[in-house]
């Protein structure tokens, strides 16, 4: 008998509670998605650290629970509904999950990614398509940043055009370390990467070792004193605004800064905060996201 997926469609107010109940009753994993995805009624949800999203689930939600062979879907759902005090057990469907080589399947979903004029981000199980290119070997992982997201791509394109040999670079919110590694491969020295997540710091260190890139990583308390030729921060608009004074102070007079993780509609709001110290504007937009870039004024 194979693993199965229990699929339940229900109203938003019950989706999270049902997910928790199914996990407590033995579901191996549970996900919630928009039951109206890919239709005119699809509802995108957005949120940022420090802010409460306007909606925490979709009006018409779909709960998908992965069950081990020994669990009977109908019995498990009835128990969950009873635990929540629902008058009736929600309607449901069951899908068989085929046995697969999950490692091979996952790897097949990640191909080398070309970025900018000469950058390739290449998973370890692939060969570089162009041996003469600027190659970053990076596997998908828990830390954000493999080059597939528009904000990472924008920052990489900016670094490729901006970094000069022996310039100092600070990557604040380094995630996987991809931007710091690229800066190093473009000739920057020294390069520092900072992140609030210790797991991201360890991931970045591992990725730098794999790419033979000498970079110093740490938590915010480890951020070196002094100023840098280049500061790059790919985070989100709210923390970027909160850290504007600190990040601007890390840029040398005449030095440059690039910021991303910013939706196009948020660009002017973020830029206006930085204009106290930085001459800054939208450098490029891609798929609704922007990269802001600017130069610190000599007088600040």
From Swiss-Prot:
It catalyses: L-lysyl-[protein] + 3 S-adenosyl-L-methionine = N(6),N(6),N(6)-trimethyl-L-lysyl-[protein] + 3 S-adenosyl-L-homocysteine + 3 H(+). Its main location: cytoplasm. GO terms for cellular component: cytosol. This is Ribosomal protein L11 methyltransferase. HAMAP family: Methyltr_PrmA. The keyword Hydrolase does not apply. Coiled coil: none annotated. The keyword Heme does not apply. GO terms for molecular function: protein-lysine N-methyltransferase activity. Methylates ribosomal protein L11. Pfam families: PrmA (PF06325). Belongs to the methyltransferase superfamily. PrmA family. GO terms for biological process: methylation. Its EC number is 2.1.1.-. Keywords: Cytoplasm, Methyltransferase, S-adenosyl-L-methionine, Transferase. S-adenosyl-L-methionine binds at residues 152, 173, 195, 234. It is found in: Cytoplasm. The gene is prmA.
